[in-house]
Amino acid sequence: MDFLKEIVKEIGDDYTKLARDIDDTEKYVDTGSYIFNGLVSGSIFGGVSGNKITAIAGESSTGKTFFSLAVVKNFLDANPDGYCLYFDTEAAVNKSLIASRGIDLERLVVVNVVTIEEFRTKALKAVDIYLKKPEDERRPCMFVLDSLGMLSTEKEITDALNDKQVRDMTKSQLVKGAFRMLTLKLGQANIPMIVTNHTYDVIGAYVPTKEMGGGSGLKYAASTIIYLSKKKEKDGTTVVGNLIKAKTAKSRLSKENKDVTVRLYYDERGLDRYYGLLELGEIGGLWKNVAGRYEIDGKKVYAKQILKEPDSYFTPEVMEKLDEIAKEEFSYGS
């Protein structure tokens, strides 16, 4: 044991420790949706990892940007002194959009990036600046890359300017390199990161299969990969948001290939906090759904009424029971 301590002392730094001294407390970023928290962490009171990369992938118009902004809003609300660096590759995020989501404009930095190399450099510089600060001066920070699929490369731009009609074979290697450097740095700094990405249909697959663009770099780097698909949510004839099906394609914190449906509003409400809990309670036998109404405390109530007055039905005792069901349904080893 003295020999190991000597090794740690001689070759180590702040991040080299005996296994017994490692802080094993998993930190989470509440997403704003209890059921989505359960899907990605195994607990409705959890969320996305507080120091790892979470990938949110889906086809065009599945609400990836709105989904990311909803998580950012919740992160900033939960951390009044926190801030977010939002790497925007599509010029899709503007002042009015951010304000419409109820996000504090003073604590969100939008960084426009065009190439993978530019994103890599700026992200690494930001993490290094953060790590150089004394630990007690580090304010909670979050990164978002929206989206990986739209990043170009220096070679692709140079070839286009020189009218070279050749395919860029460097992109996937550059993506791998960028995330190789970022993954550990983000973990050391306790900075969570959300990366949105496009998906495409795999041609020739025996069963319909979706795959993320950009090669395998993000696939290996991400702690959690969520695939999104959606349908419109209407209030009368007006489309007010999306009902989004979220499925875990990869997860180190919860079971894979599980799916839930969450409701995402287009306005400042963002993710509906309680949507999906009725279905979770039904799975765990807390209540029954009879002809579209839920039997709760001897009363039959429509889901719309329950979700309109959630505090009346989802009491602290009920939430604890739902958390136990979520652990059974989504956690490894259950």
At which residue positions do the language-model features occur?
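Catalytic P-loop NTPase motifs of RecA-like helicase/translocase cores
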Residues: 93, 151-152, 202-203
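Phosphate-binding/switch loop-helix module in NTP-utilizing enzymes
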Residues: 114-190
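Peripheral, non-AAA+ core regions of ATP-driven protein-machinery
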Residues: 18-24, 35, 164, 239-242, ...
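The Walker A/P-loop phosphate-binding site
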Residues: 2-107, 119, 124-128
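Terminal-proximal interaction/regulatory segments of ATP-powered molecular machines
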Residues: 289-334
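Residue-level preference for the first positions of well-ordered beta-strands
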Residues: 53-55, 83, 140-144, 192
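A short alpha->loop->secondary-structure connector
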Residues: 101-108, 159-168, 210-215
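Phosphate-binding/switch region of NTP-binding enzymes
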Residues: 168-284
